[in-house]
């Protein structure tokens, strides 16, 4: 089994601003190790002569024409906002320290 450490899982969690219990860290460490093992197994598969497949399903991306449309009336929007600051809508902080990830 590939070695991914609990410290690595904790580091990624910290960068992602996520908090996990010790049981969750152990579980993620085991799961990520299994995923890495599976990817390494796929790396060993001989794909020589196998035709390249762009899409395993016959689905296509259907894109609409990009058409500019009139947006909301700023004055009406700002009148409906409960809290504003310097002309912007003020919302609660998503990050506890307010800093970068």
Curated annotation (Swiss-Prot):
It catalyses: L-glutamyl-tRNA(Gln) + L-glutamine + ATP + H2O = L-glutaminyl-tRNA(Gln) + L-glutamate + ADP + phosphate + H(+); L-aspartyl-tRNA(Asn) + L-glutamine + ATP + H2O = L-asparaginyl-tRNA(Asn) + L-glutamate + ADP + phosphate + 2 H(+). Signal peptide: none annotated. One of its GO terms (biological process) is translation. Disulfide bonds: none annotated. Its EC number is 6.3.5.-. It holds the Pfam family GatC. InterPro entries: Asp/Glu-ADT_sf_sub_c, GatC. One of its GO terms (molecular function) is asparaginyl-tRNA synthase (glutamine-hydrolyzing) activity. Gene3D superfamilies: Glu-tRNAGln amidotransferase C subunit, N-terminal domain. Keywords: ATP-binding, Ligase, Nucleotide-binding, Protein biosynthesis. SUPFAM superfamilies: Glu-tRNAGln amidotransferase C subunit. HAMAP family: GatC (MF_00122). Allows the formation of correctly charged Asn-tRNA(Asn) or Gln-tRNA(Gln) through the transamidation of misacylated Asp-tRNA(Asn) or Glu-tRNA(Gln) in organisms which lack either or both of asparaginyl-tRNA or glutaminyl-tRNA synthetases. The reaction takes place in the presence of glutamine and ATP through an activated phospho-Asp-tRNA(Asn) or phospho-Glu-tRNA(Gln). Belongs to the GatC family. Heterotrimer of A, B and C subunits. This is Glutamyl-tRNA(Gln) amidotransferase subunit C. It comes from Lactococcus lactis subsp. lactis (strain IL1403) (Streptococcus lactis). The lineage of its organism: Bacteria, Bacillati, Bacillota, Bacilli, Lactobacillales.
């Amino acid at each position: 089994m590939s070695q991914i450490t609990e410290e690595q899982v904790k580091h990624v969690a910290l960068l992602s601003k996520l908090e996990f219990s010790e049981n969750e860290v152990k579980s993620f460490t085991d799961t990520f190790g299994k995923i890495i093992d599976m990817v390494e197994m796929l790396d060993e598969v001989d794909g020589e002569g196998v035709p390249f497949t762009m899409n395993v399903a016959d689905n296509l991306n259907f894109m609409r024409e990009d058409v500019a449309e009139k947006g909301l009336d700023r004055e009406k929007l700002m009148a409906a906002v409960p809290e504003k600051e310097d002309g912007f809508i003020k919302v609660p902080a998503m990050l506890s320290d307010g800093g970068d990830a």
